[in-house]
Amino acid sequence: IRNFLFLFLFFSGIIFISIIFLPSLLLPQKITLFGGKLMGYWSQYCLKIILSTKIVVKGKDNMINDKKFFIACSHQSMFETFFLQTVFNSPVFILKKELTKIPVFGWYLKKIGSISIKRDKITRDNLNFFEDISETTQNSERPIVIFPQGTRVLPDDRPPFKKGASRIYEKLNIFCQPIAINSGYVWPKNGIKKTNKVITISILEPIKPGLQKEEFLQVLEKKIYDELDLVG
């Protein structure tokens, strides 16, 4: 019953916020971004109140505040995309091109400046992908978010990180903020949501620019997976 109630209230709230903020599609971007933050806070409220989830944030002292950076985050559930909007300055997400074609939802994704890519196909857009993220980083204070695992994974899965993460690190030549989140134990990509659990968000020590691509990927993967193993 609590699982059904969570899904019903969560998605009802998201739909309500989306409708209320429809006029923002014609207004300055910052208004639409505020709607995204509300969705982030709503998701946390539903988790805490309905599923009795405890949300713990570790490593706030590791947060980068005085320089440009991008975020590399583990990905186990929808939680990450909502939560990160409440902690960082309206981050820019990299997502599948197909998502931008969904009515209403796709309009929002375009309005907030999401960077899209068509997977598994060589297109002109894909060839310009790294130029797009570089331009976004140079012209905005909003950090880009990447999910180096490539897709949502089960909590105990440890797939190797995608090489695209290291190419982004090399292209941007800025700090990387690694983040480990074990949300899959509460909000799995498939299956019933769990009650009375803890979601731990670990903001890890930044990785400086200048490493070789291969070394960066090894360091990033070890940092995130070691932390996930630690918090369980």
Residue ranges and their predicted role:
Residues 17-29, 33-37, 49-50, 65-122:
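Catalytic core of membrane glycerolipid acyltransferases/transacylases, capturing the structured
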Residues 41-53:
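A generic, lipid-embedded transmembrane alpha helix
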Residues 52-54, 90, 111, 141, ...:
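A generic structural signal for alpha->beta connector loops
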